[in-house]
Amino acid sequence: MSYKIEADEIDIHPSVKIGKNVKIKCKSIKLGEFCIIGDNVTIECNKFEAHSWLFMWHGVEVGRGGCNGKNSNVKIGKGVGIFENTVINPSESVEIGDNCGIGADVMIWTHGAWLDVMQGVPHDFGPVKLGNNVWLPARSIVLPNVTIGDNVVIGTNSIINRDLPDGCLAAGTPCKVIREGLYPRPLNDKDLKKLVEHICSDWIDLCISKGITRNIEVWYEKRKIFLNQNSLQTIYYLDDRKIEGHTNDVSEDLRDYLRRRGIKIYTDRFFKSI
């Protein structure tokens, strides 16, 4: 075993994958099915709970500064991605909703104090909450006492020091709302067909570069993607987010490529490309 867990309560699903040199020190740790913890990850807080399909990549650090108190709790929803070298500081609670993407080198802070507060300098302590479907891209910083609503897209290198409403596009230093009520805005069938056909065309080109020589056909019809390999068919249901039919390394490669392009279909298997 190349990782170390110190906890009074441990609830880790058998499917979870944990990388090398991982250090976890919590009173309570819970990891749901198909979570992946990359190499050189540190998690130190009171309680850490992640739903299924967490992707926490190399060098992520959960901790720093007063993370042993009763409020030092981290709760993460389903299908969240947290990428390289991100820092999450849970001096106070941090809650991250379903399907959030947190880019590389992001920092989330729940405390900020250094100089003598008796001299009137700024200081701040408070929880951070991200709603569902939030995209917090690379090198952004979230400061204490911030709540970000559902379906929010934020620009790279932003400093978020105030609450952001549902459905907005926001960016800047400090972060400002550019447009409200922008998301979600579901594509009609015509636009979805155009998007999916473009994605599938790119995937076919990638298959050629990977040396996949099987006879492959892929097309879109009525909010479904059809994949034929010789006489074997796989159907990807975009509304229900499920798969029916034949599955093998090629069908899984397409599922993983769809994930990379923003169409996530979860099954009882990890995403895997050829």
Where are the regions a protein language model picked out?
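Terminal amphipathic alpha-helical/low-complexity segments used for targeting or macromolecular assembly
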Residues: 1-2, 7-8, 15, 173-274
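Flexible, glycine/small-residue-enriched loop-and-beta-strand segment within the central core
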Residues: 11, 17-146, 173-174, 180-182
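Residues that flank catalytic or metal-binding motifs in active/ligand-binding sites
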Residues: 104, 156, 166
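Contiguous mid-protein beta-loop-alpha structural module that forms a pocket-lining wall or clamp
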Residues: 160-167, 174-178
